[in-house]
Amino acid sequence: MEKRGPKRRQEAAHLSCELCRERKVKCDKLDPCTNCSSAGVICVPVRRPRLPRGAHAQRLRRISPEDPEAPIQIDIASPADAGTIADDDLKERIRRLEALVDSMRSSNHVSKQLIKNFQTNKDQEAQDTIESTLNRIDEDSLLIKGPRVHPSDGGLRILGLSGSSSPETGWASIIEDREVSMQLCQVYLLNVDPVIKILHRPSLEKWMLEGQRYLGLPEGHAAVESLGAAICYVAATSLTETQSWARFHTTKSSIVARARRACETTLEKSSPLLSPDVTTLQAFVLYLVARRSEDPSRAVWTLMAFAVRIAKALDLPRGIDDNFFGQQMRKRLWLAICLLDFQTSLSQPSEPLITVAEATSLFSPPRHINDSDFDPTTSHDIPDREGLTDTTFSLVSHHVQAAGRLLNFEPSVKDDGSRQQHVQNFEQRTLRLLLYCDPESTPYAWFTWHRIQCFVSGARLSAIRPLIHQHGGHPIPILDANEGTSILSLALNILEKVQLVHTDPRGEGFRWFVTVPWQPLAIAISECYICQDRSLVQRAWPIVEAAFQQHEATVSGSSKAISITLERLMCRVRGKLLPSLELSRPGEDLALVTEAPISTSPQKVDPLVFSLDSPLLIAGQEQLLDADQSWAAWEEVIASLHYDETGRADMFLS
């Protein structure tokens, strides 16, 4: 017999991802693949040497059985022999199935439905046999180090409703890897903690960076493990691609996939639906924050109901039996839940689960202090500080969502005077927090400074263009604008501030938190249609185009009605403005505009939301004054979103 030559070790190939292989669909082998991206699930690519198929898999063996890391040696049989074995195996399986079905037909005790089911099973078994014959792989010989990814359960795993009898402990490896968890903790302290102020920074550092026990809880406590995994998950989602490669030498998607599965596994073990620990709820809320950042679907909007119910069951806002430390932790957590409830309700759109009273008058916000001012043993009250503190942005968010609820979800706030008064109160409270704040001192100070300016413009815009649909009533009169200010200018200021965060290096750590809000974008688009100031439109249109493209790329999946409405508006305005803008200012300034794709496919437009055959109101209002035209345009946008009596939508929070 001819002697076999030395075998060359195969290079790792990019194979079908785990989910496509389990679903038995063709994978395009991208990272992430198209199937997983369209399904909204995590794609975990598989890179390993190709393994033999069919009958060859039975001859797979290792050079050294004692060494699991030893390279794989493969004996190759002839293709003809492999085909014969596969055909014989397939025929034998089908023969047994047919015999079983025939014997069941002869039984008088088997129903026709059961026979039908077994016939279906026979066909399915035959198909599965063909697939398994061509793709049979020894699972124990896989060379990938990560665990298997199962199809997404939509978030039910963390609630203990996924039907899994034993959590996959392999996913906890990202937490047990101390170097990785320490790196992710540092990312959390830089990117997440300043804007989502839930935890006590010194206690977190002592636990995850110095190895001490967390708040006296025993090691291995389910609540502590779930919190650690949630911190890693939200930190991973806050990374930019550049930061991911610099810190972990891999893609962001791979880090996020590992961290998310570890978080869901540990949360399932801690049972957030039944746990009386505030720590478990902290982990659950951080999971929702991270999930919302990477997943634009309505999953987080649905899961928010659990978070709100659990928080109320724990009597979170009051916490009268706790010491000062416990009260601050409860208030911070409730504030984060209120903010997340407000944000998720806007993106659908729908009514918030938490009422205006529960979020404002019945709740006193946490202290404006630094984390270093108190510790778990502090029992006395600590007064507020002046200047920028660790909780400044968190308190700004509290005032933002409070003003947003009053202006958009409170039926009693209708007249111009009360709306303007709420805006003034909001400006006074937020600008007071900026006293002695130097925006050039730190990235956090810079981000807080510019976001507050964005929020102030949003509050003024919301007072002028409220989101309450009038349903045939009289529109709210337009407030007098300050000199040099217009509705379009306010909307542009918001869009420019968002773009600034995504382009300035100082905003890199906070880009995950800032997306393009749809309301200023819709107002800017409609105002460009009717604005008579050509120079303002020429300045505004490239900003609007860039914001629209960014919105479509990041949050377009959150609400079909919003996406369709914005796309329809853009098609209308592009058709009117592009010829005149190109004649007036051809060249580089309009490169972004001319390169932007224009989609007018009828199948993408829901007839209940917008009719392709019916013109916009703004197209037929030439006889009206500019103010009436502007209001008519906004009414058309709101009407297109609320054809189903839902009521309201986004204000100015992304």
Swiss-Prot record:
Q: Which Pfam families match?
A: Fungal_trans (PF04082), Zn_clus (PF00172)
Q: Which gene encodes it?
A: nscR
- Using the UniProt record, give the first listed, main subcellular location: nucleus
Please report the organism this UniProt entry assigns to the protein: Trichophyton verrucosum (strain HKI 0517)
Q: Which SUPFAM superfamilies is this protein grouped with?
A: Zn2/Cys6 DNA-binding domain
Record-linked InterPro entries: Sec_Metabolite_Reg (IPR050613), Transcription_factor_dom_fun (IPR007219), Zn2-C6_fun-type_DNA-bd_sf (IPR036864), Zn2Cys6_DnaBD (IPR001138)
- Report keywords, A-Z: DNA-binding, Metal-binding, Nucleus, Transcription, Transcription regulation, Zinc
Q: Function, please?
A: Transcription factor that specifically regulates the neosartoricin B biosynthesis gene cluster.
User: Gene3D superfamilies annotated for this entry?
Assistant: Zn(2)-C6 fungal-type DNA-binding domain
The record's Gene Ontology cellular component field reads: nucleus
What SMART domains has UniProt attached to this entry?
GAL4 (SM00066)
In this entry, the residue ranges of the DNA-binding region are 17-43
The protein, known as: C6 finger domain transcription factor nscR
